[in-house]
Amino acid sequence: MTRLVSLTVVAFAVLIVVAGERPHTSAVGTGTTEIIVLLDSPPLAEAPGMKSEIDAEQQAFRRALAVRVPAARVGWRYRLVANGFSVSLPSSQVPRLTALPGVRDVLPSATYGPQLDRTPQQIGAPALWGPTLDTAGQGMKIGIIDSGVDASHPFFDPAGYTPPPGFPRGQRRFTTAKVIVARVFAPKGARAPTAQLAFDPDDSSHGTHVAGIAAGNAQTTATGGRVVSGVAPRAYIGNYKVFVETDSGLTPNANSPAIVAAIEAAVADGMDVINFSGGEPEIEPSRDIVALALDAAAAAGVVPVVAAGNDYNDVGAGSVSSPANSERSLAVGAVEISGNPSKRVHADFSSVGPTTISLRLKPDVAAPGVDVLSSVPGGWASFSGTSMAAPHVAGAAALLAQRHPEWTVAQLKSALVQTGVDALDERGNLAAPQFQGGGVIALARADRPLVFAEPTGISFGLLARRSSSTGAIRLDDAGGGAGIWQVAGVRSSSSTAGGKLILPASIDVPGTVSYEVAVPAGARPGNLTGYIELRRGADLRRVPFWGRVAVAALQRHTALELTRPGVYRSSTTGRPALVSRYRYPENPRGIGVTTVLAGPERVYRIRLAKRVANFGVVITERGRKSRVEPRMVAQVDENRLTGYAGLPVAHNPYLEEFRSSVPAAGALSPLPGEYAVAFDSATRAGAGSFTFRYWVNDVTPPTLRLRSRTVSAERPVQVTASDAGSGVYPDSIVATIDGEEVPAIFRGGLVSVSTVGFASGKHRLRLRVSDYQESKNTENVARILPNTHTLTVTFRLG
């Protein structure tokens, strides 16, 4: 899901080694060293709205460096994944750097070992290739839905390839006999010069990197003489560019209409596998068109592979993104594989299940995703992220599809899930299914799965006390798997909940394993998770499961009804404190959201009789000591947050305020049903009075009107701003005069734009204002920034 965060890539500045692009640096004197200087502001990947601040900081640093350390030479410039520079200078002068303005840290250079020369071996891919690469993906087509692919890169050398009949397709100047499709899916009205091009050397690094992992040519020489290969090195590549530069001014993004169009084109072009290393917060899955399109692609015989997301460090469990929630897709988490003997460890950024709203068990599998070397335009780079893990699985799927053309998409998925091997979690324990699904893919085992399972994994969802539920797993012979298998339920170390999984002792394949989950009256809340193991002699196959024993304490409140939109006054003072945690996601402190709310709650019930685009609340005023904040939940249950939208944080990647605190909570594309908003606080001392606005179905932007086209010198330009739905979002306001960003203040329905420093005469004002609903929108809305109004007018000063 988009800017780099939503593209689910974590790239470390010191890892990036791009051949042919590095600026010239000269060694100055003896004892020259190269270090990395980090400046005060966070990088764009963490704070996308701070581009101007970062640019100003960097300019100030370079000016000061030239004056105070004239022997220093700037090499790499970092903005996306770090804010700073690499600097070469005499070792004796390094201490001078810490005294320069804006310097936060000075780090020594570090050397990292690229891994794409090892990761195919780590998942067992070369064993399937054959001595002449006859079964290395020959004839398979992998569609890369991403930011574009550099077809001229040596990793995609077309020598020895003949395109299939009817290919190449699309923008043929960006195709070869290896990269056989080049299409772009830009949003309507995109004005960036490269928006309509299937490849842009400045913005196609991510897609080129992903494509190389999936299907880069075997035995290609990369940085430092490393010899690298993609997982399915003889497969063809289809380039379906959806991440394009947008008018929002932020990093490339894609909305659902463009992504769905790309999926449809990939299916129409006959791709065997689709890889989508992007994502965003989950919405109601029955209304998630991208997830539904991937399910449809699977039904059409195309294997959909999706990155699980990179949000675990930020928001904890329940962070798997859309469209990794697609039921039929292979959602992929990331692991780091290192050491001798090798050890597989869950990557600390890799999103952990369940899915946020649908509570599905995802990811399905895991694959290498840390420090992976692959192609980028003009050279090579090492990136980390589930974006890098997913194409390992896409390549693996292509290998299996070539070797087993009779397998269905569901059978191929089962072969990878049921044969996975364990990774470790951050505590050194065997990782639970929420971290790795069936485990790290192991291609030699997946090539001979013995049995196919349907479903491949089980989510029990939320389990109430004094309840039981039943289900079944269909097992079929995949070749050599017929006969009696022993069955056992093995719980993970993190499975702390009370409850019992009841299984038969054995199963005769083909056949059905029936199960029952029983939760007693006094069961302890927590996760009920592990594997249903199938054993026959030395053979082991397994089906992952997850559920959570949960108590809906919020339902014990006497809730008030919100029957119509409007402005309300309320207080939490004197109310019961029944709930301290809300989920999912479970631990959003990494994005500045309070995780434990020990104060009292005031609860309002909301009943939706029909489908709407959205609804929500925003706190517009608090009492002097009040620290109340909102949480939106479904079914009046604190265990059913309406996803990221239910938290008081802006999560629209097109806004500069992305992941900033906002006193609003809501739901995007909700189904009819019962919801509740809980007003809560971190402590009892934070209880107090507050005023809030409640809206339903806000799909229109604010209204803006220039008050006067003539403004006295040094006086502000004034624009009336109003919004009858969610209300004007003051922090969203961006104003420029003649292209220069200027201060703007919203008060009493007026936006006042500073004209200080501008000469008398005619000027051009561009004012962008969003409402609070915009802070909750994602790429799943049909248009970019539908709740934002941009006013462009001329005025005369003086």
Model-found features: residue ranges?
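Acidic, Ser/Thr/Pro-rich low-complexity intrinsically disordered segments
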Residues: S493, R589-H651
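Subtilisin-like serine protease catalytic core
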Residues: T30, G130-N255, D269-D272, A299-G301, ...
